[in-house]
Regions:
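Bacterial N-terminal signal peptides that target proteins for export
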Residues: 4-14
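C-terminal motif of bacterial Sec signal peptides marking the signal peptidase cleavage site
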Residues: 26-27
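A short helix->beta-strand "capping" segment at the edge of beta-propeller domains
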Residues: 30-47, 216
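Beta-propeller fold detector
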Residues: 39, 82-86, 125-129, 171-175, ...
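Beta-rich, blade/repeat-based domains predominating
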Residues: 44-60, 88-108, 113, 130-160, ...
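A short loop-to-beta-strand structural motif that recurs across blades of beta-propeller domains
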Residues: 71-73, 113-115, 160-162, 201-203, ...
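Short loop/turn segments that connect beta-strands within beta-propeller blades
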Residues: 75-80, 118-122, 164-168, 206-211, ...
């Protein structure tokens, strides 16, 4: 290196330094800042019940309650929105979940149903009906196609958990809980996380190969605001929407606080990982009736 530097003239050295600085500056300018929220859609395109963002296998983003309750909307990468389907009269979805075949599943909290949507025909049918469900709220799914559903009763501030098997049979797997809301499986599918919005608890369960849960433990306890949707990244960290505070808290698999990401809106209801590398987080905001997004350092668990 010393020999090379001696052979360079002062002018050549200065030109090389300027060029290198320009490359570094250009790289920094083009890179996106991490954990900084920005608008994805305009405000007031959805209802106050905007929820459950999910990507299909082709990378199309879907969100519930576009323009009025009882609909599913589509969101383009540039933030423009359009209507996908109207649900049967009286049905209102609160979440979207896709299986490995591309089928869409929706918790219909007004009809005590889990709905199925054929993405080719856009036909909506009842996959599971259970009168004992309070108001199915959020869903997650394992690689076998089993659904796990949170089921709160907001008036009585209680809740329960269901597993819906691939044949549509509902199995009550937990009772006597608080207002169960956000629900998520760890990347290895051995842990189920469930939060209680009013009681501000996040619980964890062991999950066996048949989808049975056991070993309930308190994973994390919050002191204020509310809790809503949750998602895991590829490393198993859990991202929790803090409804009313306008932040997303990231916890390690051991339940340790990692960071808190501020949003522009306050009533964040759910989130999903997406983008080319799975490192963009898309968030639904009920007070803004629209969506925000931010860049993350780790991709979602499906990437």
């Amino acid at each position: 290196m010393v020999i090379f530097m001696k052979k360079l003239s002062v002018k050549s050295f200065l030109l090389l330094s300027v060029s290198l600085a320009a490359v570094i500056l250009n790289s920094c300018t083009n890179s996106k800042k991490l954990f900084v929220a920005e608008d994805l859609t305009a405000e007031n395109l959805f209802t106050v019940n905007i929820e459950g963002p999910a990507f299909d296998k082709n990378g199309q983003l879907y969100v519930v309650n576009y323009q009025h309750d009882g609909t599913i909307g589509k969101v383009a990468p540039d933030g423009t929105c359009s209507l996908f389907i109207e649900l049967p009269e009286g049905s209102v979805a609160n979440c979207i979940q896709f299986d490995s075949k591309g089928n869409m599943f929706l918790p219909d909290f007004t009809g005590h149903n889990i709905l199925h949507v054929d993405m080719l025909t856009e036909k909506v049918s009842v996959f599971c009906h259970e009168p004992l469900m309070y108001s199915p709220n959020d869903l997650c799914m394992n690689s076998k196609g089993q659904l796990f559903a949170s089921d709160p009763d907001w008036k009585r501030e209680i809740g329960q958990l269901w597993r819906i098997d691939t044949d549509g049979k509902p199995v009550l797997i937990e009772t006597n809980m608080g207002t169960t809301n956000g629900i998520e499986l760890s990347p290895d599918e051995k842990t189920l996380y469930v939060n209680e919005s009013v009681q501000l608890n996040v619980w964890k369960y062991d999950v066996d190969e048949k989808g049975n849960i056991s070993g309930k433990k308190l994973f994390y306890k919050f002191d204020d605001f509310g809790l809503d949707g949750m998602k895991c990244d590829k490393n198993g960290n859990l991202y929790i929407t803090r409804w009313g505070k306008g932040t997303i808290v990231v916890l390690s698999p051991e339940g340790k606080f990692i960071r808190e990401i501020s949003l522009k809106g306050k009533k964040c209801s759910n989130l999903v990982f997406g983008g080319d590398k799975g490192k963009t987080v898309f968030v639904t905001l009920q007070d803004r009736k629209g969506m925000e997004k931010f860049e993350n350092n780790i991709p979602g668990k499906k990437y």
